[in-house]
């Protein structure tokens, strides 16, 4: 297949056309008065969204050269979303502005490599300024960050703040679709894993179909238990103590399961058996977690512990265990707090070291089960389309609040970048690098201009008014159409989101500026279809 090669100014202009098409579609969504974008879907109804990265991911242009430009800016949005969870529209606007001004400078004779160096230096300085503006999250700020990120939906902001309060910053918060029209929060105390009872005969609360064990012993075993004679001495000791028993094992089957069921029905021993969570090495690690949480010794052949030698003091304890057909929840395990703290530190270290996203997610789940708990936000809406859009907003808001807890917050509404640009006014470098600094300074005004433009006001006037005020938190609140202290008004952004948006935008824009040639396939010209019956051409009107 023959390729086309486009050089220098023609290549940069082709990229710019692609960048503009994508950015112009994305930037209408910015701010509290941003508009929606409707996306056609091959299957099902169209999707309506105000999420920048969702819009960016849908865009595929016909011209292969322009499409390359669009895809590179799409990368800015995706990367910012992955790292910070929000700020995708801001990042797209910054990338468009830096690249557009850069192309003009290169066309006027500036050296692209010097421009890129200037841009990189300016971004480094601006990022430091953003960090100086940052304040740690306190009080109602979590709800405010969630509200802003969910496109000014206070209900979502408050639910996320409640969830964070209940499970702590290490807890796992998941988002699910609700069967009702109401968005609500469910929290699970203690450790829960997705394995239910092995026999419905273990149920003690018939109405709720749950087995509830108060103050039970917990036997943790990594292999199958099928032979009764290994288990019998232990069962006799437990029956004498009058306490219930939870068995967690790879499988409990045959006569072992039958004996437990018969004793349960006779009232001799209140027991329940569940399968061990996870698979392979992850199962071993999770059983060790349960052991540490409950103060029990997991029975594993690797460490030379066998079932027949187990005594009562080797078993774990908990205040209460609830088992339904799908889940087991252990509340208030009797493990040593120092041991649990040590395990939490170990898991945090593993999370920092791992390079696999899947492993990180699983480690974070284990950490949450030991440290905080699990909260589930159930998103409800009147229609399927609205629910999908709302669920995406909740997920964005959740990422943004986590980012805020991690690195703090800065004034929102595009003000943090405008204040950071102030430091660039006195920053001096040599030659064409200075043009690069000016490009970043101009780009830092762009998000505020766009927020103002989307709310139907003139951007330049607002930018000047905000810039002149000495108070760093002073800005334009587009939701109420007033000038005020944005932090006090709850218009705040996570520092990580603002910082990531600028860094990723400058990184990709700098690469595009230093492009000198583009290679793409030549689009095939489709041959005209043959004439229809009777010699009429395909476009004959009759």
From Swiss-Prot:
Record-linked InterPro entries: Chaperonin_Cpn60_CS (IPR018370), Cpn60/GroEL (IPR001844), Cpn60/GroEL/TCP-1 (IPR002423), GroEL-like_apical_dom_sf (IPR027409), GROEL-like_equatorial_sf (IPR027413), TCP-1-like_intermed_sf (IPR027410)
Positions with a binding annotation for ATP: 29-32, 50, 86-90, 413, 477-479, 493
Database matches in SUPFAM superfamilies: GroEL apical domain-like (SSF52029), GroEL equatorial domain-like (SSF48592), GroEL-intermediate domain like (SSF54849)
Coiled-coil portions: none
Domain of life (superkingdom): Bacteria
GO MF annotations, alphabetized: ATP binding; ATP-dependent protein folding chaperone; isomerase activity; unfolded protein binding
This protein's UniProt keywords: ATP-binding, Chaperone, Cytoplasm, Isomerase, Nucleotide-binding
Annotated PROSITE patterns: CHAPERONINS_CPN60
EC number: 5.6.1.7
Subcellular location: Cytoplasm
GO terms, biological process: protein refolding
UniProt xrefs under NCBIfam families: GroEL, PRK00013.1, PRK12849.1, PRK12850.1, PRK12851.1
Family designation: Belongs to the chaperonin (HSP60) family.
Subunit structure comment from the entry: Forms a cylinder of 14 subunits composed of two heptameric rings stacked back-to-back. Interacts with the co-chaperonin GroES.
Role this protein plays: Together with its co-chaperonin GroES, plays an essential role in assisting protein folding. The GroEL-GroES system forms a nano-cage that allows encapsulation of the non-native substrate proteins and provides a physical environment optimized to promote and accelerate protein folding.
Protein name as catalogued: Chaperonin GroEL
Classification lineage: Bacteria, Pseudomonadati, Acidobacteriota, Terriglobia, Bryobacterales
């Amino acid at each position: 297949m023959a390729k086309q090669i486009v050089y220098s100014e023609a290549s940069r202009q082709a990229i710019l056309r692609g960048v503009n098409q994508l950015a112009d579609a994305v930037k209408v969504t910015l701010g509290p008065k941003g508009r929606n974008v409707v996306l056609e879907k091959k299957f099902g109804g169209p999707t309506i969204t105000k999420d920048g990265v969702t819009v960016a991911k849908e865009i595929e242009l016909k011209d292969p050269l322009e499409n390359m430009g669009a895809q590179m800016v799409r990368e800015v949005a995706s990367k910012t979303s992955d790292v910070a969870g929000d700020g995708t529209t801001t990042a797209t606007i910054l990338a468009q502005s830096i690249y557009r001004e850069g192309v003009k400078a290169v066309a006027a004779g500036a050296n692209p490599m010097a421009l890129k160096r200037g841009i990189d230096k300016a971004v480094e300085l601006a990022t430091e300024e953003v960090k100086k503006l940052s304040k740690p999250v306190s009080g109602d700020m979590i709800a405010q960050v969630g509200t802003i990120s969910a496109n000014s939906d206070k209900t979502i902001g408050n639910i996320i703040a409640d969830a964070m309060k209940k499970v702590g910053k290490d807890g796992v918060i998941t988002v699910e679709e609700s069967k009702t029209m109401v968005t609500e929060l469910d929290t699970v105390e203690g450790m829960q894993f997705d394995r239910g009872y092995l026999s419905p005969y273990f149920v003690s609360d018939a109405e709720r179909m749950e087995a509830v064990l108060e103050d039970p012993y917990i036997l943790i075993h990594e292999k199958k238990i099928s032979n009764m004679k290994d288990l019998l001495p232990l069962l006799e000791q437990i029956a004498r103590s009058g306490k219930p028993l939870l068995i967690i094992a790879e499988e409990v089957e045959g006569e072992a399961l039958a004996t437990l069921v018969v004793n349960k029905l006779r009232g001799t021993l209140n027991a329940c058996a569940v399968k061990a969570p996870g698979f392979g090495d992850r199962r071993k690690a999770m059983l060790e977690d349960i052991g540490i949480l409950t103060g029990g010794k997991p029975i594993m052949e690797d460490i030379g512990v066998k079932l027949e030698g187990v005594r009562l003091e080797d078993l774990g304890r908990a205040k209460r265990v609830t088992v339904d057909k799908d889940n087991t929840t252990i509340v208030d395990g009797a493990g040593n707090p120092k041991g649990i703290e040590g395990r939490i530190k170990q898991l945090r270290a593993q999370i920092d070291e791992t390079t696999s996203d899947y492993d990180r997610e699983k480690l974070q789940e284990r950490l949450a089960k030991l440290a905080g708990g699990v909260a589930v936000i159930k998103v409800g809406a009147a229609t399927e389309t609205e629910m999908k859009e709302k669920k995406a907003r909740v997920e964005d808001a959740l990422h943004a609040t986590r980012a805020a807890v991690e690195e703090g917050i800065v004034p929102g509404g595009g003000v943090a970048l405008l204040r950071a640009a102030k430091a660039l006014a006195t920053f001096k470098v040599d030659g064409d690098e200075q043009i690069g600094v000016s490009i970043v300074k101009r780009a830092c005004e762009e998000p505020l201009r766009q927020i103002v433009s989307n709310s139907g006001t003139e951007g330049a006037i607002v930018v000047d008014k905000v810039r002149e005020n000495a108070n760093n938190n002073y800005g334009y609140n587009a939701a109420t159409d007033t000038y005020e202290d944005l932090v006090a008004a709850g218009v705040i952004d996570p520092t990580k989101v603002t910082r990531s948006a600028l860094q990723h935008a400058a990184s990709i824009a700098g690469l595009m500026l230093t492009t000198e040639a583009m290679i793409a396939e030549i689009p095939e010209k489709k041959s005209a279809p043959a004439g229809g019956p009777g010699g009429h051409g395909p476009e004959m009107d009759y």
